Amino acid sequence: FIQGHAPEVRSRWCTNEKTAMEAALGMSYAGKRALVCMKHVGMNVAADAFVNSAITGVNGGLVVLAADDPSMHSSQNEQDSRFYGKFAMIPILEPSTQQEAYDMMKYAYALSEEKKLPVLLRVVTRLAHSRAGVVVNDLMPQNALNPDQERTHWVLLPAIARRQYASLVAKQPELVESSENSPYNGMNAFEGKAKLGVIACGIAYNYVMENDPQSLGIPVLKVSQYPLPEAS
């Protein structure tokens, strides 16, 4: 489908999720944007390359889309891929609607290129196996090949890895600040005080809003970007 409608975009299947992650990472090192898609169990296979990509950093935007399967509709287990993102110390996004899934992808690439880190975008079965009309935007122009001339940080020898890891740790306050300013995190309009509130994310936020919590006097905090915002 992609090759038929956008032949300038290269897409392919890989032997497994680890090789897919490595291929996408290689394109990112060369300056191109890349997307790698897998299920939650595939994150186990890709874990080595995935975690190390946070330490090497990226050049062109790199987004990892992980589809989790709560209740095991078509999987051998349940996993929460957000723990992989937390362990790797990279930004995580979780859309609550089809429109948000579309919009978040562009945002994810911008965030990846700004922070020079891969971004994990997590979806779940009930969102992935659904349809909805979405408002589309103009296509992003492709970025040209632009290999980084300083390539030592792509090689994770211990001396380099220690330096890169320290850089990743130092970026964490920036990532928290980004979450605090994210258009996808925020409190629903609510006046007055309440004894009960709801914190929701992803498709669960949709389920909460279907019950019109505002009419019940219940404020709802929506959190769709991690690390968790810390400002009150």
Where are these regions (language model features)?
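Thiamine diphosphate
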Residues: 1-98, 103-105, 124-126, 191-192, ...
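Flexible, low-complexity linker and terminal segments
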Residues: 95-232
